[in-house]
């Protein structure tokens, strides 16, 4: 089959003779219909030294076979989507960029009838990151699956800063935070203010304005008469961490969460980094670095993805904007170069397989 794998240190290529993966306990064999690209994909390629490791994390497809240890929720022929662990140096068969892939059943969804393969392919990394960042790290209450969604901020709503509000994780985070009763404040490019407002951000701020934007945020929360205690950073670089730390209120109970190992420089702010790959509950590797399984993250992931299934079925979560790339799997490597060069913004790059 076609697949995008590591062929030498820091280099990946499309091959045409990759064997189908061997089905494991708790996994589905899926015939891939669409894949979406993430920055983590090209970053993994750059640090991978061993040949034969499959890349890609976001996919949608059709169940071909069901492995042992899986409940009756999934059937052969089901349309499914979710998160797979591409670039895993501990398990080279895992990944999305192939015609047939393995997907751990606990953290996959049945695609709702109203959603296309291309739309569903955008969910995996973002949904997992939102769950870990907002609900494990920052301890937001889970959204309810009944009742009306809040339309406008109320006096009871607490502000929540989301830096990178127009990223794939950010646009999901805004929606989930709103469903949990928070008032999302989005930091992004002005080009995407309309997008994040449509999804539920109560205010938008230009990251390029630096200290001026920080002051605008502080003025906004002052008018809310609510302190800003929580910040989620989907960009997770030194400047974004500094921005979030400056924007948080001067209180002892503030919390900053990031997607990469970086900390807020304020000593009075708790910093937490989440790594989406721990959701699989298995030992894993990133390049030459090894990480142990985290059973609590796997258990959280099962509960989280079950909730997400309900919210998607109810049409209460929108997927990110998509751009369809050319040439299917053959075009993915060129797409990753576009992503690495910051040529794709405010949308998710998706390829049909």
Swiss-Prot record:
Report the protein's function. Answer: Trans-enoyl reductase; part of the gene cluster that mediates the biosynthesis of the tetrahydropyranyl antifungal agent restricticin that acts as an inhibitor of CYP51 and blocks the ergosterol biosynthesis. The highly reducing polyketide synthase rstn3, the short chain dehydrogenase rstn4, the cyclase rstn5, the FAD-dependent monooxygenase rstn6 and the enoylreductase rstn7 are required to generate the first stable intermediate desmethylrestrictinol.
Taxonomic path? Eukaryota, Fungi, Dikarya, Ascomycota, Pezizomycotina
Q: How does it assemble?
A: Monomer.
Q: What class of enzyme is it?
A: oxidoreductase
Stated family: Belongs to the zinc-containing alcohol dehydrogenase family.
Pathway listed: Antifungal biosynthesis
Q: Give the keywords, sorted.
A: NADP, Nucleotide-binding, Oxidoreductase
InterPro entries from the xrefs?
Answer: ADH-like_N (IPR013154), GroES-like_sf (IPR011032), NAD(P)-bd_dom_sf (IPR036291), PKS_ER (IPR020843), Trans-enoyl_RdTase-like (IPR047122)
A GO molecular function annotation here is: oxidoreductase activity, acting on NAD(P)H
Taxonomic source organism: Aspergillus nomiae NRRL (strain ATCC 15546 / NRRL 13137 / CBS 260.88 / M93)
Q: Kindly provide the name given to this protein in its UniProt entry.
A: Trans-enoyl reductase rstn7
Q: What is its EC number?
A: 1.-.-.-
Task: Name the positions where NADP(+) binds.
Answer: 207
* SMART domains, sorted: PKS_ER
